[in-house]
Amino acid sequence: MDDDKLLSGDKADDEEASLEKSLRPQTLAQYIGQARVKHELGVYIEAARKREESLDHVLLYGPPGLGKTTLAMVIANEMQVNIRTTSGPAIEKPGDLVALLNELEPGDILFIDEIHRLPKIVEEMLYSAMEDFFVDIVVGQGPTAHPVHFPLPPFTLIGATTRAGMLSAPLRDRFGIVEHMAYYEVADLEDIVKRTADIFQTSIKPSGAHEIARRSRGTPRIANRLFKRIRDFAEVADQDAIDEAIVARSLTYLRVDDAGLDETDNKLLRTMLEYYDGGPVGLATIAANIGEETDTIAEVVEPYLLQIGFLKRTQRGRVVTIKGYQHLGFPYPENK
């Protein structure tokens, strides 16, 4: 490949990366949706800045794709401090955590995604770091082993999780600010889609933005992903603006139905109806039947089906509701 093509490709990649980065809001004012969460965080941030203190530790929990990582970045911008990001599985041993904490300046933010997946020994080390801003680690082995005391600057830990129930009580109780991220309203998702279209310099009609928003499962990440794919279909069709018709055609190709359910969602419901009479059936059994991990079903697939009332949990397992039956066109049994 010649140099011109290499340079051209690099430039295109840089432009695409820049566009992706620009999708992330920088301030609470730019952040669309989650009005209650934004208002509360705005109060806490303003109070901390007035007192010239670090913000209290923050726990953000809710389904994936709702903007927890983005909100952590926004908090750092609003506090005018640096942020270091990592994830629970990436911190395998206490030394990894100490290395991260050692790089923090006073007031900085450490963001840990999937914080429920921290190893127990690392989690326990966080207790003193969060409460008293120090950690003790044992250096050496055998007779020469001795504890070393590491004082830390005041900092803010922001933890994000899709499984708040998996956090231990001692860790959860050390977060002074706990915010639940809820699924987005269609109107807020419309605004997000329109903003994304503006950033990508793509014309979109109100009907097109509404249809994308309506089928995005209340999730901004899905709305943006669908927009980019529909933009591809519109481009190939030489369509000047994205309207409801091109959205509908594109989503048919993408196997996203009228309720916003994708192939996996419908496969789960159909499997439960065809093989288990709508349930109750256990999560592990469902996972084995549709070829998905139980964590994927519990964290990604199931929450929205519960939210829209197509599925419900019972002590004996998951059960498809009458709305779920109706969605797939199955008759609802009289003995249910």
From Swiss-Prot:
Where are the annotated coiled coils located?
A: none
Region annotation (Head domain (RuvB-H)) maps to 258-336
Q: Which residues bind ATP?
A: 23-24, 65, 68-70, 131-133, 174, 184, 221
Question: What are the binding positions for DNA in this chain?
Answer: 313, 318
Q: Where is this region: Small ATPAse domain (RuvB-S)?
A: 185-255
- UniProt-recorded Gene Ontology molecular function terms: ATP binding; ATP hydrolysis activity; four-way junction DNA binding; four-way junction helicase activity
The alphabetical list of record keywords is:
ATP-binding, Cytoplasm, DNA damage, DNA recombination, DNA repair, DNA-binding, Hydrolase, Nucleotide-binding
Q: Where is the composition biased (Basic and acidic residues)?
A: 1-11
Gene Ontology process terms (BP) = DNA recombination; DNA repair
- Lineage, top-rank taxon, reads Bacteria
Present the record's domain note: Has 3 domains, the large (RuvB-L) and small ATPase (RuvB-S) domains and the C-terminal head (RuvB-H) domain. The head domain binds DNA, while the ATPase domains jointly bind ATP, ADP or are empty depending on the state of the subunit in the translocation cycle. During a single DNA translocation step the structure of each domain remains the same, but their relative positions change.
Quaternary structure note: Homohexamer. Forms an RuvA(8)-RuvB(12)-Holliday junction (HJ) complex. HJ DNA is sandwiched between 2 RuvA tetramers; dsDNA enters through RuvA and exits via RuvB. An RuvB hexamer assembles on each DNA strand where it exits the tetramer. Each RuvB hexamer is contacted by two RuvA subunits (via domain III) on 2 adjacent RuvB subunits; this complex drives branch migration. In the full resolvosome a probable DNA-RuvA(4)-RuvB(12)-RuvC(2) complex forms which resolves the HJ.
Family assignment? Belongs to the RuvB family.
Question: NCBIfam families, per this entry?
Answer: PRK00080.1 (NF000868), ruvB (TIGR00635)
What is this protein's name?
A: Holliday junction branch migration complex subunit RuvB
